[in-house]
Every structure is written in structure tokens, then in C-alpha cells.
Amino acid sequence: MSSLLLFNDKSRALQADIVAVQSQVVYGSVGNSIAVPAIKQNGLNVFAVPTVLLSNTPHYDTFYGGAIPDEWFSGYLRALHERDALRQLRAVTTGYMGTASQIKILAEWLTALRKDHPDLLIMVDPVIGDIDSGIYVKPDLPEAYRQYLLPLAQGITPNIFELEILTGKNCRDLDSAIAAAKSLLSDTLKWVVITSASGNEENQEMQVVVVSADSVNVISHSRVKTDLKGTGDLFCAQLISGLLKGKALNDAVHRSGLRVLEVMRYTQQHESDELILPPLAEA
């Protein structure tokens, strides 16, 4: 490799509003493979940092790939500083993490980053599992979330199962889920969005519950029967985008849910097993 540095003028460095840290697939629409195009549709710039790189989700008959090595992962984060690409950074969002050591590396990076960006919004989707599947990450990840990432986050987006794992509390009814979410709030952690709270099965509704220190807001949406993957990643991408575009939290959550429903229906109309983003209509 030539020793000549072609691109060493940092004044020309690309800048991003968001750094998105989560999984990536070669084929499919989960993790950053759906989040990045969704964020860009909202007119925001994003850098994608992969935690795992997979051929596709495990729901196909072949499956390749795995977690990014720690040396590479820490290098990806370090390179953003070395390129001077974080001058305009406004938010970091995290999703599926490959290892507990990645979580520790990320937390150290975020702690240092916040010194230069004290108003940085950190949103954590603590991907651990769900009621149907149980825990589907490595068993040391839940404690790593509790120890390293939750103390840094302003907002988190667990499902009911993940809320139970993080708090050690039963959350199968609305009141207990709200109480568990409130137990996580702190001077830093301002809100919890429970993404799969108990809905009305008979009326085909699902609920998203927004919990903060002084309010609880229950948002109901139509339930769509589907096996599509990546809807949670899309929801978080829409949510962080809405917040950065100045939407209030409850409004951003409501709009994000509506967008996910729109994408799911559009995907079903096109008979695809992977999410397809229709054009985004500005409201």
C-alpha cells in the first residue's frame, strides 16, 4: 500500500447525525440493513457500525457469518474519530450486539464521546430475546447491558420479555410492566418505550407504552399477522429519526408505529419475506 495519504484533509470529512451500532446482513432487512435506509429516508446522515455480519437471518436453510472480532469492532469506532467524522454527531443508537465484550468496548467509547458531545442522545434497544423464543443471545449479554449500556442511555426500547430480564420482575400485565419500566429510570435514563406490551388480542391491537418519570402513555396500533423480521429495528430507526427531527417523544413513538405498519403492509402486498421500504410521506 502506498504511504501517500490521499484523504488527510479533515475539513472535508463526511459528517453524520447518527451512529447506528447493530447487526448487518448481506441479504435481508434486519439490523442496520433496514435501519440505515430508513434513517436516510428521513433526511439524516448515518454511519453504520456492524456488531455481527451475517449472510441472512437464521430463518433460512443456510446461514453464514458471526460476530465481528473485538479488534475490528473497536477499530471501527476509533476510525470515526480518526476521520474526524463526529463533529456534528447528535445521537447513537444500538441494537443487536454480538458479544458482551462489544458492549463494554461500546460503553467505553460512548463515555469518552460524551465528553465532546454532552447533549448526545443515546438510545439502546437491548436485544435479548422474546416471549416465544426465550433468550437468543449469549447468556452474558443481559448483565453487560445492565452494567455498561443502561447507565449511559437516555432511552431504551425493550419488549416485555427483555424488560423482565433486565429488571427481574414479571411484566405480563400492564401495571407490572409500567412499574418495572419505572424502576429503571434514573437521572440519565429518562424514558422506556415498551415495544410489545399486552394488547387486545380480540380487537387485533398491540400496545406500545411510553414510560417516563412523570407520565405514562399507552399507544395502540393494529396488529398485523406476519413472520417478518426487522420490524423492531425499523421502529427504532424511525424513533431516533423522529426525535432528531424535533418530534416530542410520544408523537415520535406514535408515528414510528404507524410507519412500521405501513412498511409491513407494503411488504405483504409485494409478497416479500423481507421488509421493503415504500417512499416516506412527510407529515
UniProtKB/Swiss-Prot annotation:
The keyword Kinase applies. The keyword rRNA processing does not apply. It catalyses: pyridoxal + ATP = pyridoxal 5'-phosphate + ADP + H(+); pyridoxine + ATP = pyridoxine 5'-phosphate + ADP + H(+); pyridoxamine + ATP = pyridoxamine 5'-phosphate + ADP + H(+). One of its GO terms (molecular function) is ATP binding. One of its GO terms (cellular component) is cytosol. Keywords: ATP-binding, Kinase, Magnesium, Metal-binding, Nucleotide-binding, Transferase, Zinc. Its EC number is 2.7.1.35. ATP binds at residues 125, 157, 162, 195, 221-224, 231. It comes from the Bacteria. This is Pyridoxine/pyridoxal/pyridoxamine kinase. It comes from Escherichia coli (strain 55989 / EAEC). The gene is pdxK.
